[in-house]
Design a protein with these regions (language model features):
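Active-site recognition of the HExxH zinc-binding catalytic motif
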Residues: 154-167
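Non-catalytic terminal regions of proteins
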Residues: 24-52, 56-57, 69-71, 101-103, ...
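Short pre-active-site segment immediately N-terminal to the catalytic Zn-binding motif
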Residues: 139-156
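Post-HExxH zinc-binding segment in Zn-dependent metallohydrolases
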Residues: 167-232, 240-266, 270-280
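Sec-dependent signal peptide recognition
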Residues: 1-8
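Auxiliary, metal-adjacent structural segments of Zn-dependent hydrolase domains
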Residues: 19-23, 37-138, 149, 174
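Long, internal scaffold/assembly segments composed of regular secondary structure
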Residues: 226-333, 337
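C-terminal motif of bacterial Sec signal peptides marking the signal peptidase cleavage site
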Residues: 13-14
Length: 368
């Protein structure tokens, strides 16, 4: 998911130019796995809109080419959702198979799609009949599942949402994160900064969960105090705000969109990466530490802040779409003052095991 925003503009450009929906009778172009994939997409899209998770985003209305694969990854069938042109050889699915979506069976590009995706699960700007689509694979195991965390629909909603970033949203003034010549993350991971990062990861652990408006505002103030302190230590940390705006919003949408669809909700939390206090065992080099704490953690922290903004009654959709980062929005809704930094930073340290946090940060900072 590291590079998707850079390449998603073309895929959504002209997404309103799909061919008119044609009504057909009962069809037999799909199997149970396919039908479940379409049903999941429809339910998730409806959930995102109807629950006010993100009422300007309808995932099921975007141009998508889905490829079903077997358990070895070999492509078996392809389906164009919301085709942008009349594709020769494509067959329209009836409502008995499509869950009411505009879906066409088209196997003519399944191998090309799989080649473009390669060892990943998805790709942007895949060309079908001269038009650009988001493409993704799915299979029986990641479709016929009761897990809100491991189903393929979760990834689909996340990645398609990135098209909204590129096509509609105003980008924040903060800079994106650059990569070095080897494609690695360049992010400060001093012991002092790691302590503060782990502190807000502990603060957000277990979200989304029910909190009152006053609790949400209090947690947001602690977060703002921590991030403001990070920035005062190293202004480069401002780039985390952009990351929370881009990846955090997509993480929020994918998590909330699947929240009520599956019986098994374990791991369907914003901070689904391993607990930071055990990472000194699994992260072996400083490069790995920088990659995790300079990129991965902002998916969950951004989503957590947006969840708290929602609980505080703030119009986060409008703010994010106008280019405010979650950090900036949190400062607005809490009416945060710089004089409160030491107060809420101290509260966060007292509420969580600060000595344990310091020891974890020490171990991580000593990686070579």
């Amino acid at each position: 998911m590291k590079y998707q925003i850079l390449f998603s503009a073309l895929f959504l450009a002209g997404c309103g130019n799909s061919v008119p929906v044609e009504e057909v009778g009962e069809t037999f172009h799909a199997n149970t796995v396919d039908e479940t994939a379409f049903s999941n997409l429809k339910k998730t899209s409806d959930s995102i809109i109807n629950s006010d998770t993100w009422n300007t985003f309808n995932c099921a209305s975007k141009p998508i080419y889905l490829v079903r694969t077997d358990n070895k990854g070999n492509p078996e069938a392809g389906f164009v959702i919301n085709p942008k042109s009349r594709i020769s050889g494509a067959r329209k699915l009836g409502k008995n198979e499509s869950s009411g979506l505009n879906v066409w069976r088209y196997d003519g590009a399944i191998q090309l799609a799989k080649d473009k995706i390669g060892g990943n699960l998805y790709a942007f700007n895949f060309i079908v009949d001269g038009k650009s689509y988001y493409t993704q694979t799915y299979n029986e195991s990641n479709t016929m599942t009761n897990s809100a965390f491991s189903n393929s629909n979760k990834l689909l909603c996340h990645e398609v949402f990135h098209g909204l970033h590129q096509h509609k949203l105003i980008h924040p003034s903060y800079s994106k994160q650059p990569l070095d010549s080897n494609g690695n993350i360049v992010y400060p991971t001093t012991r002092q900064l790691l302590e503060l990062q782990i502190l807000y990861l502990d603060l957000f652990e277990g979200l989304p969960k029910s909190v009152t408006k006053s609790q949400a505002i209090d947690m947001l103030k602690q977060y703002v105090a921590i991030r403001s302190t990070e920035i005062s230590i190293d202004p480069y940390v401002r780039r985390a705000n952009y990351q929370e705006w881009s990846e955090g919003t997509a993480q929020f949408v994918e998590t909330m969109g699947n929240m009520h669809m599956f019986k098994d909700k374990s791991k369907n939390v914003f901070m689904y990466f391993p607990n930071p206090h055990g990472l000194h065992v699994t992260l072996h080099t400083q490069s790995q530490v920088a990659s995790h704490f300079g990129w991965n953690v902002f998916y969950g922290s951004g989503a957590s802040v947006i969840w708290l903004l929602k609980q505080a009654g703030f119009d986060y959709v409008k703010a994010i779409e106008e280019g405010k980062t979650p950090y900036e929005a949190a400062k607005v809704v809490t009416q945060f003052k710089d004089s409160e930094i030491s107060i809420y930073l101290g509260k966060a340290k007292r509420t969580h095991n600060w000595k344990r946090i310091q020891e974890t940060a020490r171990k991580l900072s000593e990686k070579k």
